[in-house]
Amino acid sequence: MSCMGAAVNIITTDGPAGRAGFTASAVCSVTDTPPTLLVCLNRGASVWPVFNENRTLCVNTLSAGQEPLSNLFGGKTPMEHRFAAARWQTGVTGCPQLEEALVSFDCRISQVVSVGTHDILFCAIEAIHRHTTPYGLVWFDRSYHALMRPAC
């Protein structure tokens, strides 16, 4: 699986169960009518109960140079320290949007399918916020790679 390159994303939520976020590369477009993404989340992850209860999330696609933030959200760092390391806006669903992301997709979880150890979260896009940063970040062969041509 390490040879499957993918965009690096920070998935965030905020709601009745609290604020949480994690780094994910298992994210992709499902359909444009209605606009839907999918996000894969391990049911054993510490953030799973928060996302499961809140039922909203924001997919923040990272830009080149945001590797430290990806590592922070991918580790065991307490949530308040993760969110303190960047600037955030609040999306229409109430989820945190990373100000310097390449793009942020503000979503409601419309369906959940369990496969093995993971839940596949189907996410209906409510709003898209495109940022001015042009260069993307991908994860390939267990390392980060900056896209040095404009991604959007």
Swiss-Prot record:
Source organism superkingdom: Bacteria
GO molecular function: FMN binding; FMN reductase (NADH) activity; FMN reductase [NAD(P)H] activity; riboflavin reductase (NADPH) activity
Enzyme Commission number(s): 1.5.1.42
Coiled coil: none
Alphabetically ordered keywords of this record: Flavoprotein, FMN, NAD, Oxidoreductase
Induction (record text): Up-regulated by the nitrogen regulatory protein C (NtrC also called GlnG) and repressed by RutR.
Catalysis performed (reactions): FMNH2 + NAD(+) = FMN + NADH + 2 H(+)
Pfam family, one: Flavin_Reduct
GO biological process, one term: nitrogen utilization
Family: Belongs to the non-flavoprotein flavin reductase family. RutF subfamily.
Role of this protein: Catalyzes the reduction of FMN to FMNH2 which is used to reduce pyrimidine by RutA via the Rut pathway.
Name recorded for this polypeptide: FMN reductase (NADH) RutF
